[in-house]
Amino acid sequence: MPDLISTEELTRLEHMIVYEKRAFSQGYQLIAGIDEAGRGPLAGPVVAAACILPKGLLVPQINDSKKLSPKVRERLFERLTTDSAVRYGIGIIGQAEIDRVNIYQATILAMLMAIQQLPVTPDYVLVDGMNLPHPDLPCLKIIKGDQLSQSIAAASIIAKETRDRLMCQYHREWPGYGFNQHKGYATELHLEALFKQGPCPIHRRSFDPIKSMLEVEIADDF
């Protein structure tokens, strides 16, 4: 049974497919939206998702993942990832690689990996807020793209929900930090645990205050 969509919601959703419609009118057929989750946290990976929605599909309530309640975000995640007409790929870059290349480059790597993981190759890519240097595909950077493009919003939901679930798994391995609550972000709870226990293996050594903590430890050894 098709979704019942209010006139107001239909108008909002129509505004969210303007970029996709423009790409379709230019002859592109497989248009991927791409977004990331986890650039700012002190711990855990950065996760990117690429998502290709079928032409004409409107997904009620879809929006920037950060604007959705956990319950709505989880429901939309399940809908997107179980719909055989929706194609998606996920890229995950862990803490060690983030520390090695920096978070910006790690985010690009995660996005490129997400495109590679798609079951089909897109011919056009809409990217949330970043210039993505793909060697073969035209990519359009859209500021606040997760609010302006349905494809990017879908990718943002898949990326965030995937990362949140990973952080809940990490909580079971390192329960003393509260990863299941803050997902690695620098909350008061997280910082208190970090200063009390020190960093665990998934903490980003190149991020402050962890970097400064480790520098002090090294200095104290001399």
Swiss-Prot record:
The answer, when asked if Kinase is one of the entry's keywords, is no
Q: What single Pfam family name could you report for this chain, choosing any that match?
A: RNase_HII
Q: What EC number(s) are associated with this protein in UniProt?
A: 3.1.26.4
Its recorded reaction(s) are: Endonucleolytic cleavage to 5'-phosphomonoester
Per UniProt, the enzyme's principal EC class comes to hydrolase
Q: Which SUPFAM superfamilies match?
A: Ribonuclease H-like (SSF53098)
> In terms of domain of life, where is this protein from?
Bacteria
Q: How is the cofactor bound?
A: Manganese or magnesium. Binds 1 divalent metal ion per monomer in the absence of substrate. May bind a second metal ion after substrate binding.
Q: What is its main location?
A: cytoplasm
A GO molecular-function term, please? RNA binding
Recorded family membership: Belongs to the RNase HII family.
Protein name as catalogued:
Ribonuclease HII
Protein's organism: Protochlamydia amoebophila (strain UWE25)
Question: Gene name, please?
Answer: rnhB
